[in-house]
Amino acid sequence: MKQLKAFKFRLEPNQQQKVLINKTLGCCRFLYNQMLLEKQTKYKSKDDSKLKTEKEYKIEFEWLKEVDSIALQQSRLDLKTAYDNFFRKLKSGQPTNLKFKSKHNPKNSYRTINVNNSIRVEENRIKLSKLGFVKFRKSREVSGTIKSVTVSKNILNRYYISVLCEVEVKTLPTSNSKVGIDLGLKEFCITSDNEFVSNPKYLRNSELKLKKAQRKLSKRKKGSNRRFKQQKKVFRLHE
């Protein structure tokens, strides 16, 4: 049986690659916003004509040619998905608004597809369109067939890559053995075989730290340097 599995790693691009990643993020965001604006204008004026394609936008804005063309195509598909969800919620009585993408978003990302082995992993490097081989912190092996990757950048100026692969999953053999599990407060669980599993309370401790950091953030003045620094601390706890 096959299923999709994602492998996420910290990217370590060089300075030139950072510039191109930032440019790709900006171009995808620009194209999404331009198409959304065009779509809204046509909707208000009841214009049924088709939207301009990313190829037509490249003629108007030549600097769009500098980045991965597949990433731009995916940005257009993201807008289509957003509009489909918008009308689906509208029909079900859940009015919502389509928002423009902001460069001030704490996390920006773009997605690209593996076409003719354009994306591949070699040791601790991954080959990406336009970027070439980019180093990453290889914490585990990437298995299966690479379908797509998502490159992201967070508020801490850290770059990450999520590699989506199609992997073969082995079906576990059926067993007639049974075990009872009792979840508790002091111990995480106790089995019918009298096995005790301790409760490290990682989630509880993390939630307390996050709550304290968010409380401090709420007291910081909007737009201030101290608020921006506190936002980074909150985001670091979310990682």
Label each PLM-derived region with a short phrase.
Residues M1-E239:
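Nucleic-acid substrate recognition interfaces
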